[in-house]
Amino acid sequence: MDNFLAQTLAGISPDITQGETESFHWRWQMPGVLELTPAVEVDRALVLSAGIHGNETAPVEMLAALLSALFEGKIPLRWRLLVILGNPPALAEGVRYCHSDMNRMFGGRWQMFEESGETLRARELEQLLEDFYSRRKTRIRWHLDLHTAIRGSRHVRFGVLPQRSIPWDEHFLSWLGAAGLEALVFHQTPGGTFTHFSCEHFGALSCTLELGKALPFGHNDLTQFTPTAQALATLLAGEKPMEGGTRPIRYRVVAQITRRSDAFVLCMDNQTLNFTPFKKGTLLAQDGDEQVIVTHDVEYVLFPNPNVACGLRAGLMLEKLA
């Protein structure tokens, strides 16, 4: 399967939609979706997704390089693998989304948005995961959704984990550290992200990986993501990651800043980095008569964005875990 990324960006369906290499069978399912099934029997299923936001290109380039290595036989495949480029039209245009933010739509929340290409795609991707995870009995299910952040960050690479009713598998968290993540953020409530969906509905060990800052195709320095790319290659091959490295700092979400009206003001400048700390009593945002104030001794901001639509999240506030 040559030129998967180029064909996806061009909106071209391949002439040949399935085939085999020495180590796996591959099948093109729809634009931006490729399934690889190892020739040997495995009990592990992995979803690797990127491009849910079309301006976040570094992870897409990373996935394209991993696919090339798989097809060239440089990496043996020891997982059932589903590769998803989430929003091909937005990727082609170089925009975050064409109509609405798809990463707020999963878990059926697409029904709450005006119908668009993104709502239809979110519905398709939900069905794809249903088919993929249920087709064969698998002991281990992982989903890694690769993103980049709009803003710079005090942690260049970090992970955001969905709410989960049972404790997290420490092996999974250790792998995230081996993949170069400097911090892990744990959600406490449900949400509409792709990883919330896979975790809640299929019991997958899921994480949104934030890898640097959003840049156009061709402008990414992929060397800064070498630890992540190497960890993914090792994972696909069924090998254990290298031991050692620094344990990621852990945070949990303690509050959400929501823009409720056009009067909303975020009391941070546009250069405020992710994980910037704020002391207790600091005014974070104002929306008419409503004020959002830091209530813990120290809280750290994540994803501050005053330009979201009314009713959507304009930021998260975090607390550092011991």
Curated annotation (Swiss-Prot):
Pfam families: AstE_AspA_cat, AstE_AspA_hybrid. Binds 1 zinc ion per subunit. The keyword Hydrolase applies. It catalyses: N-succinyl-L-glutamate + H2O = L-glutamate + succinate. Pathway: Amino-acid degradation; L-arginine degradation via AST pathway; L-glutamate and succinate from L-arginine: step 5/5. Its EC number is 3.5.1.96. Transmembrane segments: none annotated. Zn(2+) binds at H53, E56, H147. The active site is at E210. GO terms for molecular function: hydrolase activity, acting on ester bonds; succinylglutamate desuccinylase activity; zinc ion binding. Its cofactor is Zn(2+). Keywords: Arginine metabolism, Hydrolase, Metal-binding, Zinc. Coiled coil: none annotated. InterPro entries: AspA/AstE_fam (IPR050178), AstE_AspA_cat (IPR055438), Aste_AspA_hybrid_dom (IPR007036), SuccinylGlu_desuccinylase (IPR016681). One of its GO terms (biological process) is arginine catabolic process to succinate. It is an enzyme of class 3 (hydrolase). SUPFAM superfamilies: Zn-dependent exopeptidases. Transforms N(2)-succinylglutamate into succinate and glutamate. This is Succinylglutamate desuccinylase. It comes from Citrobacter koseri (strain ATCC BAA-895 / CDC 4225-83 / SGSC4696).
